[in-house]
C-alpha cells in the first residue's frame, strides 16, 4: 500500500498507526535515499512522539534486514546474538562482550552485531579492538570466524550501508529515534536466538513481540530496574521471553541465583582501555562484581541459545567456563583467528 511522506507525518501528528505495508514503503524510501532529510527527520521524530507501535517497528526491521549485507551461514543451531540497545547511561564495561566469550566457551555459537560507542564509554567494537581482534572482516570471513571459533563479530557499518542515508539526520537530531531500537533486531547472520538488553522498561514487552513477529526462536529481552540494558546485579531485572512461539513476562533477581546485589556504579569504566582491563580480569577468574555480572549474563545467554535448560543451569556452565580458563582461551583464539583471517583478505 502506498503512502506519501506527508500522509505519514499527518498520521504521526494525529497519533494514528502507520500500517505494515505503508511502513515498508516509507522505510524503503529512507534506506534507498529517496526521502528528503527534512521529511525523514519529521517522520522519525513524529514516530517517537506518538510512540512507535509493534507493527511499525516490525515493518521497519524487515526493511533494514532486506537492505543488510548478510553473513552466509547455513547452520544456525545454538546461534545467538548478545546485544543491547545502548543508551542506558550506565557506562559499565562491555558486559555483553565478555559474556560472549564465556557463552562460546560453554557451547553457544555467537553472531554478535555491534558498533562503536555512541553514548557509552565503550561500544562492543571499541572493546574488541582494544583486545586486539580484527572487527572489520568481510561477511564471508565472519562466517569463517564462526566456523573456526564459534564467534563472529559483525561491525554494523559493514552490514548496513543503506543506513548512511539516515546518518546525518540522526546525528543532527541528537535524540533517540526508531533507529536506536532497530539495530538489535537486524542480525545479519540471521541468528534465531537473542539476549537483548533495552534502555526502557516499555521496550521489554515491545521488542519481544517484535521478535515474535520476525520469527525468532528463543528471545530474552531484559531491562534492569537500576536502568541497565543487561541482566542486573543492582536490582530486579524485567524479562520478556519468547520460546516455542509463546511470550512470558517475569522478573528475576540476583539473589535468585545466589549472587550478592551490587550497584552498577561499581562496574563503570571511562573508556575502552579500562573496559579491556575489566574483561581480562573476569576471564582470569578474578572474584568480584564484574565476574558475577558476566556469569549471570553469560548464563542467561546459554539458556537463550538452547545450550542450557534454564538460567541457573547456564550460570553453572558459565562459572565452569571461566574457572577452567576455557573462556580466556576462547577470547585468545578469537583474537588470533580474526587477525589471521583479516591478513588473508
UniProtKB/Swiss-Prot annotation:
Q: Specify which residues bind 5-phospho-alpha-D-ribose 1-diphosphate according to the UniProt entry for this protein.
A: 84, 87-88, 92, 94-97, 112-120, 124
Q: Does the keyword RNA-binding apply?
A: no
* Entry binding sites for anthranilate 1: 84
Q: Which reaction does it catalyse?
A: N-(5-phospho-beta-D-ribosyl)anthranilate + diphosphate = 5-phospho-alpha-D-ribose 1-diphosphate + anthranilate
* GO biological process assignments: L-tryptophan biosynthetic process
What is this enzyme's EC? 2.4.2.18
Q: Establish whether keyword Glycoprotein is in the entry.
A: no
How the cofactor binds, per note?
Binds 2 magnesium ions per monomer.
Role, per record: Catalyzes the transfer of the phosphoribosyl group of 5-phosphorylribose-1-pyrophosphate (PRPP) to anthranilate to yield N-(5'-phosphoribosyl)-anthranilate (PRA).
Q: Which family does it belong to?
A: Belongs to the anthranilate phosphoribosyltransferase family.
* Gene Ontology molecular functions: anthranilate phosphoribosyltransferase activity; magnesium ion binding
Q: What is the scientific name of the source organism? A: Herminiimonas arsenicoxydans
Looking at the UniProt entry, the stretches that span the membrane are: none
Protein's gene: trpD
InterPro entries given for it?
Answer: Anthranilate_Pribosyl_Tfrase, Glycosyl_Trfase_fam3, Glycosyl_Trfase_fam3_N_dom, Glycosyl_Trfase_fam3_N_dom_sf, Nuc_phospho_transferase
Q: Know the name of this protein? A: Anthranilate phosphoribosyltransferase
PANTHER family, per the entry: ANTHRANILATE PHOSPHORIBOSYLTRANSFERASE (PTHR43285:SF2)
Q: Where does Mg(2+) 2 bind?
A: 229-230
Q: Which cofactor does it need?
A: Mg(2+)
Pfam families assigned to the protein according to its UniProt record, in alphabetical order: Glycos_trans_3N, Glycos_transf_3
Summarize subunit and interaction data from the UniProt record for this chain: Homodimer.
